[in-house]
Amino acid sequence: MHIKADEISTIIKEQIQNYSQRIETTEVGTVLSVGDGIARVYGVQDVMSMELLEFPGNLLGMVLNLEQDNVGVALLGDDTGVEEGSTVKRTGRIFSVPVGDAVTGRVLNPLGQPLDGLGPLNATEKKPVEVKAPSIIDRKSIYEPLVTGIKAIDAMTPIGRGQRELIIGDRQTGKTSICIDAILAQKESGVHCFYVAIGQKASTVALVADTLRKHGAMEYTTIIAATASDPAPLQYISPYSGCTMAEYYRDHGQHALIVYDDLSKQAVAYRQMSLLLRRPPGREAFPGDVFYLHSRLLERAAKLSDELGGGSLTALPIIETQAGDVSAYIPTNVISITDGQVYLEPNLFNAGVRPAINVGLSVSRVGGAAQTKAMKQVSGTMRLDLAQYRELAAFAQFSSDLDKETQTKLERGARLVELLKQPQYQPMQLPEQVIVMFAATKGFMDDIPIDHIQNFSKTLIEYIQTMNPKILENISTQQALNEELDQQLTTAITECKKTFLPMNKR
């Protein structure tokens, strides 16, 4: 074998010339203690608050406490592979999640990782989960309605785009159902929907995803799930992750709706973390900044000014009460932050009034500004009529002989209560709502038996769709009732009653 010395020397010279010394430095620390999803780390001197640290086994942790000689880190996953003395690396990244159209139709965890088995997420952009809410100058007053498809809400506690409307009530009163209905009602509206499940059973989240898929709503919806089996830090961060994904549309001049189900469980997860981080407890053992926990989240829902594109983010936070106690710490906090609340009552739910909305305690602080003129015209007296009905119904229990006027109010009130009942997952379009409200408030339903009210409202809509679809079109385009429309509706309802009443007398 012949060795060419000149060739070897040329190769060696080339390698010497091309040699570049690369020094990589990473700041590392050591785990002092770990347990219950919280680690104490020593040695990461220049770490930032909310920075991600890398633990053994590619486990990420989020820095929450910056102390004199160590940092408190919330672990975003299973901590069984972490032990005392483990090495921790700084990543230099603040907790961020993927945003954009790639997340639509997916079920993700709060880190933005897919849970639905539909392959990897092809998102090109990431945004930090903790951002500042829009300032006063950046906002515009709310004026566009966000139709939920639920008659009782759209008529009496209307929600506008950019509003925060709290859904509050005991367990098993239909809080999630109202929010799912609101998502289903956005099918034609171009609103991007986000459902954040916090501390829910995995089976419940699967059921919600299945319901949305069946109704074709997953095409414009994203689910962010931190289930009951996930560590507390993931449950704590999930609303912020969902909010960041939804803000992408708000900041691009589009409209988004986000449901937080529910913030009571997020507060419990935050309390658990805070106590493990040895932060001083306050009322009900919650830390002192639990109000700020929810206010900084809900303030990010806004209607932006025209200069910033006029986009909006509407929030429907859910709070679960214990035995109807709305004066507990978390419920009062969230009530004071939001622009109104829909209060659900177990007594109404058990009596078959579903959705079980207590109209007297429910309120929208945006009110008529978020309602179309047509809806205002037909539902203006409704809240008062129902309030009077309740008062008279309570009084009528003690009195047998009632005058004609009282009797009429009681009869109409009972029909209104019946009319506002609605089956699950069947949101109504706004023009259809206007028609049935018109029939009820103008007294056209007074002679229809109470147990036929639902049937009549269905028949009436079908009749108008078949015989005079122009009415629905006009309500939709004009968004107000004029004399001509009034007359057309009156004629249509009268004609429909002529065919409906004989059928039900047989």
Curated annotation (Swiss-Prot):
Q: Which InterPro entries match?
A: ATP_synth_asu-like_sf, ATP_synth_asu_C, ATP_synth_asu_C_sf, ATP_synth_F1_a_nt-bd_dom, ATP_synth_F1_asu, ATPase_a/bsu_AS, ATPase_F1/V1/A1_a/bsu_N, ATPase_F1/V1/A1_a/bsu_N_sf
Keyword Ion transport found: yes
Query: Site (Required for activity): which residue positions?
Result: 362
| Reaction it catalyzes | ATP + H2O + 4 H(+)(in) = ADP + phosphate + 5 H(+)(out)
Q: What's the protein name?
A: ATP synthase subunit alpha
Q: What is its EC number?
A: 7.1.2.2
Task: Fill in the subunit field for this protein.
Answer: F-type ATPases have 2 components, CF(1) - the catalytic core - and CF(0) - the membrane proton channel. CF(1) has five subunits: alpha(3), beta(3), gamma(1), delta(1), epsilon(1). CF(0) has three main subunits: a(1), b(2) and c(9-12). The alpha and beta chains form an alternating ring which encloses part of the gamma chain. CF(1) is attached to CF(0) by a central stalk formed by the gamma and epsilon chains, while a peripheral stalk is formed by the delta and b chains.
According to its UniProt entry, this protein's organism is Lawsonia intracellularis (strain PHE/MN1-00)
Molecular-function GO term, any one: ADP binding
Which Pfam families is this protein grouped with? ATP-synt_ab, ATP-synt_ab_C, ATP-synt_ab_N
UniProt enzyme class: translocase
Subcellular location(s) per record: Cell membrane
Keywords carried by this UniProt record: ATP synthesis, ATP-binding, Cell membrane, CF(1), Hydrogen ion transport, Ion transport, Membrane, Nucleotide-binding, Translocase, Transport
